[in-house]
């Protein structure tokens, strides 16, 4: 049997310091930014020659925080509420034999004049900060876009976005406008697990240097941000 050992060519840096809050798919939060910083041996501008002719990229990456000890053929997709099982190869579950992820992101710019350059700036990411990147390829609309494709069970169990409200105290934080909009769009996707919809519970989500604390009302379809704490001396998760 042919086997191949692969190594990361780059590391993705994002505002997602923990798994909770990461969009379930790439592109759901267009404002979620990331920077691809190459490993030293791959920091050659020639490797990116022509990449700026494209608007989107495919990123092949690894679920570095998941440790799959043995093959599990059935998984419980979040979209099915954690109650129904599907075959692992019929889902995008992170619990996979080789732990590989695939994301389509927007190419915003390439920064060549940097000590760690070239750096690729992208948006619409769904990756944890520090995620290993194994390959990068251009997105080709004529080949990669399939308008008549079927979404399978995902079409019948779509996620409904929720309305995000800010308390006055939370609005007084030092969060800039761009970050505020990004946080709103992240929370509008309702990052809570399908089995954890407790009302009046204070959730904590980290994005960038901020700890965002919120409560949710599933019946009203709202999430209310109650406090924003800047993480100066490390991150202290709300429990």
Descriptions of predicted regions:
Residues 120-154:
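Flexible glycine-rich active-site/ligand-binding loops centered on an Asp-His dyad
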Residues 1-45, 51-53, 141-185, 194, ...:
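Arg/Lys-rich, positively charged N-terminal/basic patches that mediate binding to nucleic acids
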Residues 2-8, 95-105, 208:
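Short coil-to-beta-strand transition motifs
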Residues 47-101, 195-199:
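Active-site-adjacent substructure of cysteine-protease-like catalytic cores
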Residues 198-218:
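Basic/aromatic recognition patch in beta-strand/loop cores that engages polyanionic ligands
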Residues 217-239:
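Enriched for short, Lys/Arg-rich terminal
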Residues 17, 109-120, 219:
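Short, conserved beta-turn/loop elements at beta-strand boundaries and strand-helix junctions
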Residues 15, 110-113, 125, 136, ...:
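Residue-level recognition of beta-strand microenvironments
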């Amino acid at each position: 049997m042919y086997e191949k050992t692969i190594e990361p060519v780059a590391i993705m840096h994002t505002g997602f310091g923990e798994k909770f809050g990461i969009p379930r798919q790439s592109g759901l939060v267009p404002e979620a930014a990331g920077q691809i910083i190459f490993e030293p041996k791959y920091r050659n501008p020639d490797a990116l020659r022509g990449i700026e002719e494209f608007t989107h990229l495919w990123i092949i990456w690894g679920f570095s925080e998941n440790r799959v000890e043995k093959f599990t053929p059935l998984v419980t997709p979040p979209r099915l509420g954690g109650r129904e099982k599907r075959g692992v190869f019929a889902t995008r579950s992170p619990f996979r034999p080789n732990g590989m992820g695939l994301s389509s992101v927007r190419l915003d710019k390439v920064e060549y004049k940097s000590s760690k350059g070239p750096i690729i700036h992208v948006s619409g990411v769904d990756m944890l900060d520090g995620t290993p990147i194994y390959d990068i390829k251009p997105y080709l609309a004529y080949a990669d876009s399939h308008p008549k494709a079927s979404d399978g069970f995902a079409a019948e169990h779509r996620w409904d976005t929720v309305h995000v409200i800010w308390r006055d105290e939370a609005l007084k934080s030092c969060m800039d406008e761009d970050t505020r909009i990004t946080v709103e769009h992240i929370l509008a996707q309702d990052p809570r697990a399908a089995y954890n919809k407790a009302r009046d519970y204070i959730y904590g989500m980290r994005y960038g240097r901020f700890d965002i604390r919120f409560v949710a009302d599933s019946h009203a379809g709202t999430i209310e941000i109650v406090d924003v704490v800047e993480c100066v001396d490390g991150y202290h998760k709300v429990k």
